[in-house]
C-alpha cells in the first residue's frame, strides 16, 4: 500500500522539480539587481539610523546610566580598598 502512495507522490514531485521555476519566481536580471542596490542600502541605512536613535533614547530615559554610575563607583571603591590592603601587606 505504501508503494502505491509513494510512487505517485514521487512522480508529482519530480515533475514539479523538472518543470523549473515559474516566470514570477525566475531570477531578475543582474543589471536591475545592481540598479536597486543603492536604494536598498539607503533604506537599510535609514532603518538602522532610526533603530539606533530609538535605542539611544530608550537608554537615556531608563535608569541604566544611574546603575552604571553606581557600578563604576563600587568598582573604584573596591579597587582603592584592595590597593590599600596590598600596599599595607607588602610594605
UniProtKB/Swiss-Prot annotation:
Q: According to its UniProt record, which protein family does this protein belong to?
A: Belongs to the apolipoprotein C1 family.
* A single GO molecular function term of this UniProt record: phospholipase inhibitor activity
Q: Which organism is it from?
A: Neovison vison (American mink)
| Name of the protein described by the UniProt record | Apolipoprotein C-I
Role summary:
Inhibitor of lipoprotein binding to the low density lipoprotein (LDL) receptor, LDL receptor-related protein, and very low density lipoprotein (VLDL) receptor. Associates with high density lipoproteins (HDL) and the triacylglycerol-rich lipoproteins in the plasma and makes up about 10% of the protein of the VLDL and 2% of that of HDL. Appears to interfere directly with fatty acid uptake and is also the major plasma inhibitor of cholesteryl ester transfer protein (CETP). Binds free fatty acids and reduces their intracellular esterification.
What are the record's GO terms for cellular component?
high-density lipoprotein particle; very-low-density lipoprotein particle
Q: Which domain of life is it from?
A: Eukaryota
Return the Gene3D superfamilies for the record. Apolipoprotein C-I
PANTHER family, sorted: APOLIPOPROTEIN C-I
Q: Report the InterPro entries cross-referenced here.
A: ApoC-1_sf (IPR043081), ApoC-I (IPR006781)
Its signal peptide is 1-26
Location of this chain's protein in the cell: Secreted
> Keywords of this protein's UniProt record, alphabetized?
Lipid transport, Secreted, Signal, Transport, VLDL
Q: Which GO terms describe its biological process?
A: lipid transport; lipoprotein metabolic process; negative regulation of cholesterol transport; negative regulation of lipid catabolic process; negative regulation of very-low-density lipoprotein particle clearance; triglyceride metabolic process; very-low-density lipoprotein particle clearance
Grouped into one coarse class, the protein's main location is secreted
